[in-house]
Amino acid sequence: MKTIAIIFDPAHGKDVKGKCSPDGRHKEYLWSRDRINNLVPRLKSLGYDVYVTTDSDNEPGLSYRKKFATQLKTENRKLLISLHNNAAGSGLSWMSAQGVEVYTTPGVTDADVCSDIILRQFKKDFPEFKMRFYKDSYLERDKEASFTVLMGSGYMGVLIEWLFQDNKDDVIFLADLKINRKFENSLVESIEQINEHFKS
């Protein structure tokens, strides 16, 4: 019996400018939706109720995403996972920043527990990637921001910034099918651990 319902939130729509690599090869909207399209059936097969804030390739608006998660009716505790790629610049030039970040809202909440589980699993599965922790200690590994999609009520929200789409090396990783499958596996394992945590 699963105790949490998963709400996936895909990255910015394809009609939002600048959400790609400087050479245009990598598209954040597509990477995010491809991951979610693979994750949804896997998690459903494990017994989870899984939802997606939008099935459009275009941008529905940040408030729409938040409203979807807030108003979703389910008997289970809700966990929203927003999947993004990071960027250090405006998207016009290659930059040097690399690695992985996870964001929650300001303050310590149950979302911090979720983000800590996710980040520890990422660190285990991807020792070659830089984990950009706020501080490498329990419930402080995530970074905090008042991102609209995280600010709704009645759900735990985490926003994953998976690698930098304006770093040449990270873009190679983002295009690697094996790494993408490994990312999906790592996130599924994290969700299983989160589910177990909130059973008690």
Predicted regions and their residues:
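Solvent-exposed loop/turn segments at secondary-structure junctions
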Residues: 13-15, 56-60, 85-91, 107-110, ...
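Active-site-adjacent mobile loop/cap segments within catalytic or ligand-binding domains
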Residues: 7-9, 20, 26, 72, ...
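Long, well-ordered alpha-helical scaffolding segments within enzyme catalytic domains
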Residues: 34-40, 44, 113-128, 172-200
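Active-site histidine-acidic residue metal-binding/catalytic motifs
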Residues: 1-66, 96-98
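A short, glycine/acidic-enriched catalytic loop
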Residues: 15-27, 87-117, 121, 125
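Short, well-structured alpha-helical segments in soluble
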Residues: 65-75
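Loop/turn elements at helix/coil->beta-strand transitions in domains of secreted/extracellular proteins
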Residues: 2-4, 43-50, 74-80, 128-129, ...
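A structural preference for short, hydrophobic beta-strand core positions in alpha/beta folds
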Residues: 52, 133-136
